[in-house]
Regions:
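C-terminal hydrophobic helical "lid"/dimerization subdomain
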Residues: 2-10, 281-285, 328-380
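Glycine-rich beta-strand-centered segment in the early N-terminal region that forms part
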Residues: 30-46, 59-109, 113-114, 122, ...
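Mid-domain Rossmann-like dinucleotide-binding core that forms the NAD(H)/NADP(H) cofactor-binding site
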Residues: 90, 154-155, 161-163, 167-252, ...
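Cysteine-cluster motifs in flexible loop/terminal segments that predominantly coordinate metals
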Residues: 98-155, 159-161
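A generic alpha-to-beta junction signature in SAM-dependent methyltransferases
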Residues: 195, 262, 274, 287-288
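Glycine-rich phosphate-binding loop and adjacent beta-alpha segment
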Residues: 221-222, 239, 244, 249, ...
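Conserved amphipathic alpha-helix within the SDR
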Residues: 254-264
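N-terminal Rossmann-like NAD(P) cofactor-binding module of classical short-chain dehydrogenase/reductase
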Residues: 271
């Protein structure tokens, strides 16, 4: 049995990708409905992330037509069967996480949501949910595939495992960035690095995810948090988020400056938040002996980065990949940190686009014109 409110329309608007040469175009498609273990969310806003950009540009293969958008906030309007006893309710405001654990596989059973095999095999490769089918279709019944929940639409079906209720003091539109930008930042600091109080940190590339890493690392007690980027505009607000120093690596030798700031040692942990060879090199260059480099940024396609073998071996340095976080445990924690003011999610959102402007917004992101995070705001 499903539980729903009666105001759900039969159709909705969605930004659909049919051709990577054309980009996103708004279409009217059928409003989806949740199946077992899922909820339907009326989307208030959807964050705009580089991962979507890789698909839009064709660098990451994905079945088309598709609705992208993988971090949302909104209101539950329908519960699928089996959700009644989870505590989720119609009318509840929630944040939706991009990494949607199936809850049944070996990784999920051991609490490692970030390694959920069905998520990668079904959703990330085939654009479907865990019964092997998409929830989206055109008015004619043509399947439309889902990148995560397909949040660039007025409504989105999300597994109940990937939503967390938000309290009344959380603003829904900016809260859309909690499900990827903040969740990924939290996972990198808490899970990937296992950051300890008093350690020193460098964050290479301070976009939406990098900015969250800066403030979360500071909140977790890092002694120094050094923000590194090639944009003075992006670096300007970093001290307000907890950075103790900033470095423009286009103007200053990042390694030399980090060594100066750390008394010649380098940092205990460096985070790489863009996914290109240059930022990998910088993140490795600033590491101390025994340091941990945590890459978070996804590369385009099968992009590779070089590692200096002897230095990594002789200096006992570690590279610890971090993808998202453990959604069922960590998304509620991220919401709590935002509610308590530890994560400043509102100011990170620098631009709002309407659904019709989604393609324009991703072009601005591609052209590095977005500071922090932009969102598609369904109220516009």
């Amino acid at each position: 049995m499903t539980t729903q409110t009666p105001q759900i329309p039969e159709t909705m608007r969605a930004a659909v990708l049919r051709d990577t040469e054309v980009g996103l175009q708004v279409e009217t498609i059928r409003t989806p409905h949740p199946r077992t273990g899922e909820v339907l969310v009326k989307v208030a806003a959807c964050g705009m992330c580089h991962s979507d950009l890789h698909v839009i540009g064709g660098a990451i293969a994905f079945p088309l037509p598709a609705v992208l958008g993988h971090e949302i906030a909104g209101t539950i309007v329908e519960l699928g069967p089996g959700v009644e006893h989870t505590g989720l309710k119609v009318g509840q405001n929630v944040a939706g996480g991009f990494l949607m654990p199936c809850g049944q596989c070996e990784a999920c059973s051991s609490g490692r949501d970030e390694l959920c095999a069905p998520f990668f095999e079904l959703n990330r490769l085939k654009g479907v949910l865990y019964d092997g089918e998409t929830r989206l279709s055109t008015l004619e019944g043509e399947p439309v595939y889902m990148y995560s929940m397909g949040g660039l639409a007025e409504y989105a079906v999300v597994p109940a495992t990937a939503v967390a209720p938000t309290p009344d003091n959380i603003e829904l539109v900016p809260a859309s960035i909690l499900g990827c930008a903040a969740l990924t930042g939290y996972g990198a600091v808490r899970r990937g690095a296992d950051l300890h109080y008093g350690e020193t940190v460098a964050v290479v590339a301070v976009g939406g995810v990098g900015t969250n890493i800066v403030q979360i690392a500071s909140a977790f007690g890092a002694k120094q948090v050094i923000a590194i980027d090639v944009s003075d505009e992006k670096l300007a607000p970093m001290k307000g988020y907890g950075a103790t120093a900033t470095i423009n690596s286009a103007k200053t030798d990042a390694r030399e400056e980090v060594l100066r700031l750390t008394g010649g040692k380098g940092v205990d942990v460096s985070f790489e938040a863009l996914g290109i060879p240059a930022t990998w090199t910088t993140a490795l260059d600033v590491l101390a002996d025994g340091g941990r480099m945590v890459p978070i940024g996804l590369g385009a396609g099968v992009q590779t980065a070089g590692v200096e073998i002897n230095r990594t071996v002789r200096r006992s340095q570690s590279i610890l990949g971090s993808y998202g976080a453990r959604t069922r445990q960590d998304l509620p924690a991220v919401v709590d940190l935002a509610s308590e003011g530890v994560i400043n999610y509102k100011e990170i959102v620098s631009k709002h686009f309407s659904l019709e402007q989604a393609d324009e917004g991703y072009k601005a992101l591609r052209d590095q014109k977005i500071q922090g995070r932009a969102v598609v705001d369904m109220s516009l």
